């Protein structure tokens, strides 16, 4: 029997947050964190095919989708506090499996640094992680999206502060299974693409059990273009977390 979806609004520090949650038979809940200025609607096509053994928790960050505006600074540290408060309000207990896209990986990364014993694994989709603060190239597709959505979710200064917060507080994640998925469909020059890939490669050192997947037919929105790869990644991380010995993918396609 399929678990019922619960759609609720919780008020945290005066801001109303829209959430959706279902329970799973395994006790593990996948927590989805969307990219910059993007609502939780972005995950709907992917969630439709996730097995019922997994619980699912999604939400709209402040100022996005069906959530209200917040007077608090829109930094990753503040957003992690809000996520933790929402999980507590919704009575969604660990263990968690984190799946995040782009800037969402900054929030997930900081969350994992604070609560690595509650998170059994992470899947990062084209993450804005690593030494991103000193990154000289941002893919054109991401730059346009970032500029367009900036007014929805904070300022450039807050975005930069979030990257610095993570860099300052980054810790090694031990044996936490970690998969990084990089998009492969780029129009930029090779050197710039190589810099982006190197950024993602550097993230692998955060865990003793990490792997990399190149989604060769995907744009920045891998979960839209090749959702089957994301499904495989989630299941692979889950298996690795259960066994702490399962091999992780090195490449796809």
Curated annotation (Swiss-Prot):
Pfam families: Abhydrolase_1
SS bond list: none
Coiled-coil ranges from the UniProt annotation: none
InterPro entries, per the entry: AB_hydrolase_1, AB_hydrolase_fold, AB_hydrolase_sf
PANTHER family: MONOACYLGLYCEROL LIPASE (PTHR43798), MONOACYLGLYCEROL LIPASE ABHD6 (PTHR43798:SF5)
Protein known as: Uncharacterized protein YqjL
Lineage: Bacteria, Bacillati, Bacillota, Bacilli, Bacillales
